């Protein structure tokens, strides 16, 4: 395990910030201030120090600062100094060099590198108000949420998902064209694409199964915490095979066979009706003896928080990757005093760096002396003195 913490964070023309710099000293940070002050923007900046679109999931063109009358956002940058174990701090950064650009540049110690290299130094995991509707949204949202948990522990999962999606698009283009024109699709090409889909699909299913089992074990060991226990499940056929211990070759073979037999059906439907892209995450509240979707909003929030904390705990024991950095946006406001105190104790015990936001300073009373307090407002970022 390599400890990792952000020592500093610098923003330039990012969202509401023309310029901002936060020195953390490697400590956890709680950010408080009025709605719209820019607290979540700071968490989003940290989340972009990882591959992907960050915690808001928007296009890169949207995050550049834009003044009235400007058609597109400006070029923007996020940079950080990251301390990993006993090594010297490392400078990482990302941004776009031209306003409205769709691709970002990533730099490590001033050298341009692929975005995947960010995961070698920091792994943000987050919980935001957008995830409050996780149990009400379509299966794709829960699948995307769970895949982020998988990716944090197995970075190759993202590349496998991209490979699967690309092969899926190519296969569907052939099948839809054949369905519309009546001309047969190239069978050899379809077989080759389905072989790729089966390979990537089996890898995805097994990675999801490994992650689910690890998270369930972590959650089961957390019975003494004042957060609800959850039983996790994956509903997809291929994930079920992986959970039951089916070897990779068996999943790959059966998926390839299923795809081949579904060509006509998929072409007529205009979408693939079998594969790991159809799976779903199921969460069951053990004490309430009911699915999470039937629980109160408060219990749903607590279930997801416990899942994120379990994820942080399991990743903190990884041997070959940096510790996660936890981003909790407006989470404390939805917890009662007992759970708020438990959250502070949990974050302290995990010895991981966390960034939390809330409108009221009193929400973080249990973190005072254990984390750095920062007021976010019109005057910028104001660091509080420790009491």
Swiss-Prot record:
It comes from the Bacteria. Disruption phenotype: Increased susceptibility to UV light. One of its GO terms (molecular function) is ATP binding. Keywords: ATP-binding, Cytoplasm, DNA damage, DNA repair, DNA replication, DNA-binding, Nucleotide-binding, SOS response. It is found in: Cytoplasm. Gene3D superfamilies: P-loop containing nucleotide triphosphate hydrolases, RecF/RecN/SMC, N-terminal domain. One of its GO terms (biological process) is SOS response. Pfam families: SMC_N. InterPro entries: AAA+_ATPase (IPR003593), DNA-binding_RecF (IPR001238), DNA-binding_RecF_CS (IPR018078), P-loop_NTPase (IPR027417), RecF/RecN/SMC_N (IPR003395), RecF_2 (IPR042174). One of its GO terms (cellular component) is cytoplasm. PROSITE patterns: RECF_1, RECF_2. ATP binds at residues 33-40. Belongs to the RecF family. The RecF protein is involved in DNA metabolism; it is required for DNA replication and normal SOS inducibility. RecF binds preferentially to single-stranded, linear DNA. It also seems to bind ATP. This is DNA replication and repair protein RecF. It comes from Caulobacter vibrioides (strain NA1000 / CB15N).
């Amino acid at each position: 395990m390599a400890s990792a913490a952000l020592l500093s964070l610098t923003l330039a023309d990012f969202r509401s910030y023309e310029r901002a710099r936060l020195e953390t000293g490697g400590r956890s940070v709680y950010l408080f201030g009025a709605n719209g002050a820019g607290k979540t923007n700071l968490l989003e900046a940290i989340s972009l120090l990882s591959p992907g679109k960050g915690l808001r999931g928007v296009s890169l063109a949207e995050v550049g600062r834009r003044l009235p009358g400007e058609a597109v956002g400006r070029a923007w940058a996020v940079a950080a100094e990251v301390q990993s174990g006993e090594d010297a701090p490392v400078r990482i950064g990302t941004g776009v060099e031209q306003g409205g650009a769709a691709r970002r540049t990533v730099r490590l110690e001033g050298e341009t590198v692929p975005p995947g290299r960010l995961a070698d130094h920091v792994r943000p995991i987050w919980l935001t108000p957008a995830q409050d509707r996780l149990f009400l949204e379509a299966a794709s949202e829960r699948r995307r949420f769970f895949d982020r948990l998988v990716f944090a522990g197995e970075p190759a999962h993202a590349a496998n998902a991209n490979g699967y999606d690309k092969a899926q698009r190519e296969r569907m283009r052939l099948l839809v064209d054949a369905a519309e024109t009546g001309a047969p699709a190239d069978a050899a090409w379809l077989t080759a694409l389905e072989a790729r889909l089966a390979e990537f699909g089996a890898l995805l299913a097994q990675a999801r199964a490994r992650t689910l089992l690890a998270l369930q074990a972590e959650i089961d060991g957390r019975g003494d915490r004042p957060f609800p226990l959850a039983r996790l499940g994956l509903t997809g056929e291929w994930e079920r095979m992986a959970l039951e211990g089916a070897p990779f070759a068996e999943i790959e073979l059966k998926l390839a066979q299923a795809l081949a037999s579904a060509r006509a059906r998929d072409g007529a439907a205009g979408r693939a009706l079998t594969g790991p892209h159809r799976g779903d995450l199921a969460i069951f509240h053990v004490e309430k003896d009911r699915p999470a979707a039937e629980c109160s909003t408060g219990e749903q929030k607590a279930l997801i928080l416990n899942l994120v904390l379990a994820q942080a705990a399991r990743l903190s024991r990884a041997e070959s990757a940096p510790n996660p950095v936890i981003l909790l946006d407006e989470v404390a406001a939805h917890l009662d005093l007992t759970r708020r105190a438990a959250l502070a104790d949990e974050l302290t015990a995990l010895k991981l760096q966390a960034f939390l936001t809330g409108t009221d300073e009193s929400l973080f009373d249990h973190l005072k002396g254990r984390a750095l307090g920062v007021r976010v407002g019109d005057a910028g970022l104001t660091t509080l003195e420790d009491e």
